[in-house]
Amino acid sequence: MEQEQKATQEQATYEEWTAPEPQEEKAEERGGNEPQEENAENLQQENTQAQQEALEEQPKAEQEQNDELAAANAKNCRTRSEDKRNGNRYLRLYADFENFRRRTRQEMEAAEKYRAQSLVSDLLPALDNFERALKIETENEQAKSILQGMEMVYRSVLDALKKEGVEAIEAVGKPFDPHLHQAVMQVEDSNYEPNTVVEEFQKGYKLKDRVIRPAMVKVSQ
């Protein structure tokens, strides 16, 4: 009998000692699952929010990209326009420089070519006087000798001027040329074609291809 009571007490003690353990495990299991579910919900919410923010940021990013592209295109257009203006400005400056250099060269060549023009212009009145004097006819031997000396001087001056490119303009018998001749009279003359120089009153001269003084002439009608 005592053995049965002892066994019954031991069994009760064992049950009291072992009974709470399953309840604690269940509590632990319940307590362990709740945070996991909460974490999953939070993660899903974060993903959803991130997707929404990404969708919201996408138009902004596209707009910023479009703005940057438009700004780059505008800058490129300004650069091309400025390059074109600079190119045109360079071409104008280059053309102006070339024109200046050409004019300078022409002026220097003209100055060298016609350097005797001033001297020739000053000598023309003296040549006219020589020509008028040499037309004088005289029987006086002394006067003839003087005229011969004057003619020698006159020829020497003409030779010197010829070396510088000075020559008399042909007039009598030539068609009238307003660039070479100055008509002071017109006459009817059957011996000449109309508009032909029939008489020269004063010699004309030119230096190379430049007329220093036109010939003063009479022209047939």
UniProtKB/Swiss-Prot annotation:
Matches recorded under Pfam families: GrpE
Places the protein is found: Cytoplasm
GO BP term (any one): protein folding
Entry annotated with the keyword Cytoplasm: yes
GO cellular component: cytoplasm
Cytoplasm keyword on record: yes
Keywords: Chaperone, Cytoplasm, Stress response
Lineage top rank: taxon: Bacteria
Bias kind Low complexity: ranges: 41-53
Primary location group: cytoplasm
GO molecular function per UniProt: adenyl-nucleotide exchange factor activity; protein homodimerization activity; protein-folding chaperone binding; unfolded protein binding
InterPro entries cross-referenced by the UniProt entry: GrpE, GrpE_coiled_coil, GrpE_head
Family the entry assigns: Belongs to the GrpE family.
Subunit structure of this chain's protein: Homodimer.
Function: Participates actively in the response to hyperosmotic and heat shock by preventing the aggregation of stress-denatured proteins, in association with DnaK and GrpE. It is the nucleotide exchange factor for DnaK and may function as a thermosensor. Unfolded proteins bind initially to DnaJ; upon interaction with the DnaJ-bound protein, DnaK hydrolyzes its bound ATP, resulting in the formation of a stable complex. GrpE releases ADP from DnaK; ATP binding to DnaK triggers the release of the substrate protein, thus completing the reaction cycle.
Annotated protein name in UniProt: Protein GrpE
Lineage, opening ranks: Bacteria, Bacillati, Bacillota, Bacilli, Bacillales
Gene this protein is translated from: grpE
